[in-house]
Amino acid sequence: MIFSAHRSIVVIVEGSLRSLALALVVAIALAGSAAAENGEFNRRATATAQILAGITPPAGDPALDRLVKLEAFAEHQKWMASHWGQARSRISAIESWRGQQVKISGANNKTLLYPFSGPDFLNAYAFFPDHPLYIFFSLERPGTLPDLESVTPAQFGKMLQDVRNAFRDIFERNYFITDYMSKQLTTPWIRGTVPVMATMMALMNLRIIRIEPIDLYPELTNSYEALEAKRPRRLMLGVRIDFSSANGGPLHQLYYFSVDAADKWLEFYPDFLDWVAQHRPASVLLKSASYLLHDSQFEKTRAMILSSADYVIQDDTGIPYRFLQQSPWRVRLYGRYHKPIKGLRYGYQADLESAYKAKSNLPELPFPFGYHWRGKRSGLLIANR
């Protein structure tokens, strides 16, 4: 993403409540796993996501059957088919490349950490489809799926237009633009990241088992909502989405949190980084992140990632190269290095540019990744230990 403001992370509970919170998360995961194994899924949520994706869901829900007969849906299907076709070819290239280049031991028992993610489920799932747990965090509110029960034809047409607006950049560029998202994800019909992530799940032929709000710090939330309380710039909001493949495969869980990850704002949620660190060793995805981890205001978040990760896929906007040059990290470079785009020149890394120049015949990157998405100008780095 391109950021105009600082990005984010998440939380849990204090002192003696920590173990209780962890037990609750484990219990929820076990319950969701049992539901997935029994072939259960939320038909309304899955069908709603399919409609937003331009996919006709199975008939049988009168509230939705009426909508897929409208001309607005036919137009939306045509647009999504065209634009998703382009994005799907990119995803296929990522999947093919991943099969050859990405080797993660024990992937089916690992967590993917995606800092500054926005609603970008597509890249997370394309690179790390075997991970059972995903932790996303960024500034955008989670929101909810739209309710299609009583939407009018006119409202439905506006909703689908909002979906197209929200997907335009990720389909074309393979990243979101923060300034645009502040408008795209706050319309009367598309609110927050949940509608976008759910739509992406439908496009990837996944089924939604449940979507539930999560508040890992209810006591803090209550105290910050009090009048005259000293509070963070943004209250942390969370959501958990359980999903599985269409054939009823293993359960996956996605935790998304909206919170500012700058050091001074994380002071309002002091245990969050410890909670994230409990998922070590984690895989990490960083892309189009406005070089936030180069900024001294994000030192705590950067330190947590470096101590918790054992496998990182990123572009040059992620962890500064100087940290990954050090033992015990091993680095592989792909594609090309280009200086940062206009407005982000402070992210230039002479050492990374030199590393690219020092290696001849670096493997090409067969898909766009990061801000240099036009042509074959993208670069990607894999670091593991």
Language-model regions: role of each:
Residues 1-17:
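N-terminal secretory signal peptides that target proteins for export/translocation
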Residues 32-36:
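Sec/Tat signal peptide C-region and signal peptidase I cleavage site
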Residues 117-128, 135-137, 173-198:
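Short, thiol/selenol-centered motifs that function as redox-active sites or metal-ligating centers
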Residues 134-185, 208-227:
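Thiol-based oxidoreductase modules, predominantly thioredoxin-like and allied folds used
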Residues 202-273:
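Active-site/pore-lining binding-face segments in mid-to-C-terminal subdomains
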